[in-house]
Each structure stands twice: as C-alpha cells, then as structure tokens.
UniProtKB/Swiss-Prot annotation:
The gene is ruvA. Residues 1-64 are annotated as: Domain I. It is found in: Cytoplasm. Signal peptide: none annotated. This is Holliday junction branch migration complex subunit RuvA. Homotetramer. Forms an RuvA(8)-RuvB(12)-Holliday junction (HJ) complex. HJ DNA is sandwiched between 2 RuvA tetramers; dsDNA enters through RuvA and exits via RuvB. An RuvB hexamer assembles on each DNA strand where it exits the tetramer. Each RuvB hexamer is contacted by two RuvA subunits (via domain III) on 2 adjacent RuvB subunits; this complex drives branch migration. In the full resolvosome a probable DNA-RuvA(4)-RuvB(12)-RuvC(2) complex forms which resolves the HJ. Has three domains with a flexible linker between the domains II and III and assumes an 'L' shape. Domain III is highly mobile and contacts RuvB. One of its GO terms (biological process) is DNA repair. One of its GO terms (cellular component) is Holliday junction helicase complex.
Amino acid sequence: MIGRLRGTLAEKQPPHMILDVNGIGYEVEVPMTTLYRLPAVGEPVTLHTHLVVREDAQLLYGFAEKRERELFRELIRLNGVGPKLALALMSGLEVDELVRCVQAQDTSVLVRIPGVGKKTAERLLVELKDRFKAWESMPAIATLVVEPGSKTAVTSAENDAVSALISLGFKPQEASRAVSAIQEENLSSEEMIRRALKGMV
C-alpha cells in the first residue's frame, strides 16, 4: 500500500494531477477540496494516498489531510459507494460539513451531489451516523504542504473547470451554466470549480 507521496507537482488537470517523485510520475486523483490547496506546477507537495487495485487498473487517490483519506476509506466501505461517488461527496463538502450533515441527518445537501438520490442519501446518513461519532473530536492534521506565496497558473480556466465538473458527474449543460454564472474575471480553474460547486450544492 502506498500511504504517502512527497514530490513535485508536475501536472494539474482536475480532478487528476501528476506528482513527480524522483523522476517517476504518479497519476493521482484528488477531491476538489484537495485540489484547491495545491501549489503551482513545479512546487513541492505531500499527499496522503490510498491505492485501489482492480483487475484492469491500479488507481491512486490523494488527499491533503489524513482525516480526508480516512473519510474516503469510510465512504468506500459503504454498500453502493465506490471511489468516484466518494470523491464527488468530498468535492462538494468539506470533511466537517459532511460530518455535520450526518449528525443532523440532513439529506437536503447530499441530494445535490451527482449520483445521490433521496433514498441513497437517507441510507448513507443512517450508515454513517455511528461511524462518525469519533470524528466529532478528531483534529485536522498533516495539512498539505504548500509553499508560501505560490500561485496557480491559469490556462483555459473555464474549460478546465467545466471538464472537472463533468468528471464529477454533473451534466455538461449544468457544468457550463454553473461556470458561466460566475461573474468575477481572471479566476483560476480551481477557484471557478469551488464557486461553481457552491452554487450547485
């Protein structure tokens, strides 16, 4: 199991990134909550990782904090929740927001996530309630390493944002509308994704 990677950010194409570790490029899929905190390409970064081995592929998932990785592991243990849905949930909600949602048994937020209907949301909340009791006092630890003053380069930011939203399960029309609704100019793709998700979830 690969539990942690430290290297140089080589590429960033939401929701994927490539981390160069001593000349080897690891393709890592990350939730948007981690993507927001990535530094510029060429900067050092440390990720907490989870490896999924399938018959046809080995998939690596990366997270800014250990508690995010633990949440991912809790989610994929649930019936009917695979890595894609787990990342969609974590991209739409911060860890603490999801914990509060489970504590309040509030389905209204979850049903806005792609792939989560009302019945699925209700089942997830019931199954997660007992599992999340220990999370109430669990501190945020091992934050992603980001160099001070790092800035993300903006290249076709709108297209990247739309592509990332589609990869999370949103329909192309929904993704385009959400990005087009953002009024501010000169935003990075990560900031566009963040604002679009806030408007959709």
